[in-house]
């Protein structure tokens, strides 16, 4: 089975079907942003389209008109790079829709791929709602889900979430090992995920955590008390075993009141000197350095699907216009 072929121009589309397609990163950086951009760019070039990378998100477009025509060599090594080579931030197009429309028209964009998480979804929604005021936004636009939180509406998988889980497994295993070495220590680990408990739930499952706190299942005094009683029972039965370290997982948005530090303090107070607690916050380390193999595979599939959607949308429009012209004639 061949996974590549010579660039012999056999896949080039007719000149009238070639498009200018913009690619932009929106939101927090995550693994596989670059891999998806590379896949979309290479697909576009193989078909004769012109891919434009919008640099530094919508703020870069609005302030500086930062668009760059992407070539083969520009994205050649992007498949294994984390972060965002184009640059990304949380700025939304609503900050200056007029400037966004101006640059879209200036570069004659005929399709847009927005890669990111919930902010990317929000940006797509804003552009769609502004179509009546800015006709250029009537082009086909897609949101390619890419966020460690895996919380983009209407999607089942987001790029970067698998890489995040792999990083957290190693992190939590190291934390639990430290807790075990101290025999009587509990770690409360705070993980990212926004308002989705996906990351916290999976990490709690694969690392053997005693409790997991997510936004979907709110923390209250009763549940916390039950978890502490379970913790006491576990320590009572361990009798100083060398694997007696314990761990709680808390999503960053699980509660505004019961913070990671507060939960750790409550556990320490309940221990009455029999066991102690610590907090561990991996922070932006969770975004990972290099995308996992799964994220890389999905990045290619998602990138190509986005391009195919834009192609099919424009083909449908051309066919409809052709029919109207023929009827008029």
PLM regions and their residue ranges:
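Glycine-rich oxoanion-binding loops at beta->alpha junctions
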Residues: 1-14, 61-112, 119-121, 148, ...
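N-terminal phosphate-binding or glycine-rich loops at protein starts, especially the Walker A/P-loop
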Residues: 9-62
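Short glycine-rich or small-residue beta-strand-to-loop segments that form or flank ligand, phosphate
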Residues: 20-30, 84-87, 110-116, 187-190, ...
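Short, ordered loop/turn segments at secondary-structure junctions
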Residues: 26-28, 49, 54-59, 90-91, ...
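Short glycine/serine/threonine-rich phosphate/pyrophosphate-binding segments
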Residues: 30-40, 61-62, 94-98, 118-126, ...
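Glycine/threonine-rich beta-strand-loop-alpha-helix active-site module
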Residues: 41-70, 125, 129-175
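Accessory alpha-helical/coil subdomains and C-terminal extensions
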Residues: 51, 103, 114-116, 122-131, ...
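C-terminal non-catalytic interaction/assembly regions of soluble proteins
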Residues: 262-329
